[in-house]
């Protein structure tokens, strides 16, 4: 129920909230990872050869990592951590690039989502982390934010004449 409100606010307990969180974990997180892994072996991520759509998803991954690192470490705002991962997972499920590099970027996104959610939902994340090909999530290092992934190659600028 950490996504329901900031820790300093009270909220009314709801079975619907528990059911919604369970449904999101099962359908959005678990099923997305299972479907992704069913695609077979993954190539190594080659940042230099990414398309603009792949770069956009990768930017979202690293923006989410940076935001959640701040939310966990400084702000203790667990509800915004969950919201950020939900937003990232929405982008992942809408991403339709099944090329090798597209799948590699999705793998990076799913790895980040599981690692971010692990302090909040440790049991399911432990299993998903191992399914993604890693060891024990309890001893995993936080993923570093790639500053180059945060750079935008095209910026829209409105100019009034």
Regions found by a protein language model. Give the residues of each.
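Long, charged, mostly alpha-helical binding arms that flank functional sites
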Residues: 1-104, 147-149
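Basic, alpha-helical terminal appendages of large translation-related enzymes
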Residues: 10-15, 93-104, 108-161
């Amino acid at each position: 129920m950490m996504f329901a409100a900031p820790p300093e606010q009270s909220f009314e307990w709801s079975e619907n909230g528990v059911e919604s969180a369970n449904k999101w974990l099962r359908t959005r997180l678990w099923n997305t990872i299972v479907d992704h892994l069913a695609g077979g072996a993954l190539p190594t991520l080659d940042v230099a050869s990414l398309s603009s759509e792949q770069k956009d998803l990768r930017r979202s991954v690293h923006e989410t990592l940076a935001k959640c690192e701040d939310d966990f470490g400084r702000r203790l705002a667990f509800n915004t951590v969950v919201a950020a991962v939900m937003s990232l997972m929405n982008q992942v499920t809408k991403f339709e690039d099944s090329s090798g590099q597209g799948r590699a970027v999705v793998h990076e996104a799913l790895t980040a989502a599981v690692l971010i959610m692990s302090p909040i939902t440790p049991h399911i994340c432990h299993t998903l982390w191992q399914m993604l090909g890693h060891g024990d999530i309890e001893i995993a290092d936080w993923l570093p934010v790639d500053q180059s992934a945060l750079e935008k190659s095209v910026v829209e600028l409105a100019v009034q004449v």
